[in-house]
Amino acid sequence: NTYDSFGHAMEIYKLVNINNDSIPELYINFGTTAGGDVICTYYDGKVVEQPMWNYGFSYMEGQNIFRDAGGHMDVYHDKIYSIENGQFVLLHEGNYGAADNSHVQFDSDGNPIYDYYWDGTEVSSETEYMNLLNEVYNAQQAITPFDGAEYDSETWRYVGNGLCDYEEIIEAINTY
C-alpha cells in the first residue's frame, strides 16, 4: 500500500460511510497542512483516492455527498463530490478570495473584499455564494471525523469517535 512507507506518528484514520454501500471509505489525515487529507474508496479490487485540504472534510453520512473545504492566504475553495462506480465525481466547485492577495482590500467594517465564483461563474456576493453552496450541501447536517473527538496530549492526537492510529485502523479494516 502506498501509505505503508510513510511515518505514522501524526496520521489519523477513520472508516466513514459516505455512499452507504457495504464497504466503508477510509479517511486519512496526515497531520499537516502540507500533507493534507485523503479519502479512499474501494471498488472493483482497487483503492481509489481523492486528495483534500487538511481538516476540510465533511460528509452527509450515507447520502453519497461530501465536501472538501480549504484554502489559505485569501484563496479558498469548496468542492462537493460524490462517488460513482468507484470514481470521485466533482459535482460543484466554489472559489473565493482576493483578486490580489498581496494587496487585499477591506470594506468599511474591516472585512476583506473577496471575489466569489460558483461552478466557474462569478457571483455577486458572499451571500449568493453561500446560498448556492447550501442548495447542494447542507453543512448544518454534515459531520466530520473529528465530531465528538478530543485531543489527547499524551498521544499528541485526536481520539474518540472512531478515530484510529495506524495499528488501530489496520485492525479495524481486518475485522470489518
Model-derived regions: residue spans:
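A short, structured loop/turn motif at beta-sheet edges
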Residues: 17-23, 42-46, 82-88
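Acidic, small-residue rich beta-repeat scaffolds with periodic aromatic anchors
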Residues: 68-176
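Hydrophobic residues embedded in beta-strands of well-ordered beta-sheets
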Residues: 37, 47, 64-66, 88, ...
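N-terminal "mature head" segments of proteins
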Residues: 1-8
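Extracellular C-terminal loop/segment signatures of secreted glycoproteins
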Residues: 36-60
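Structural motif
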Residues: 33-39, 75-80
